[in-house]
Design a protein with these regions (language model features):
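Anion-binding alpha/beta catalytic cores of soluble intermediary-metabolism enzymes, centered on
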Residues: 1-194
């Protein structure tokens, strides 16, 4: 509701006088209207806010009025971690629970495209696993290696992609050095694929 939005803005010293507030009768209508605004080019991004995920996603994936593309829908957390020098995108920890290899290609490309939209100067994707070496007994390491080869061959574009990497050596230069990992992504990743 307008009054609540205005009160929160005032309480936090935020001037929203020049911003449009779109009122709707209920949460499902809010999701539908938000998706329509993006489709019409009047909004550039969707923010879930307090909507339930299923309400928002129902509007997003609706065939006639949603935001479907040729790729699978995926989720990205965009985080500003004060102790890390780069903004981080973490994908996909919310929508695709057990993605296939094809799904992972879409998830990675979606995150890369988001990073470019957010004007990351260089996109460095770390495909995470429990370890940073390829192990035939650990399927996620094999998939990570295959995804990197797909990036090498232009099937995933717009970023430097490396994996498998463990979380510590994906974001810590110290861990990268200790484990002697030669990688342009290790220790400097700004997209983490979980």
């Amino acid at each position: 509701p307008r009054a609540r939005i205005e009160a929160i803005a005032k309480e936090n010293g935020i001037d929203i006088a020049g911003l449009p507030i779109v009122e709707t009768p209920h949460s499902e209508a809010s999701a539908e209207k938000a998706v329509a605004l993006v489709r019409e080019g009047k909004a550039e991004a969707l923010m879930k806010g307090s909507l339930h995920t299923d309400e928002l996603m129902a509007a997003v994936v609706r065939r006639e009025t949603g935001l479907r593309t040729s790729r699978r829908v995926s989720h990205c957390f965009v985080m500003d971690v004060p102790s890390y020098e780069h903004t981080l995108i973490v994908t996909d920890a919310a929508v695709n629970i057990a993605p296939t290899m094809e799904d992972k290609v879409h998830i990675i490309q979606n995150a890369i495209d988001l990073a470019h939209a957010l004007r990351f100067p260089e996109v460095r994707v770390a495909i995470l696993s429990a370890m940073e070496t390829v192990n035939p007994k650990v399927p996620s390491t094999i998939e990570a290696a295959a995804l990197c080869k797909m990036a090498d061959r232009g099937q995933i574009t717009g970023a430097i992609v490396d994996g498998p990497l463990a979380l510590d050596n994906a974001i810590s230069l110290e861990s990268k050095a200790i484990k002697k990992i030669a990688s342009p992504v290790a220790g400097r990743a700004n997209v983490l694929v979980v």
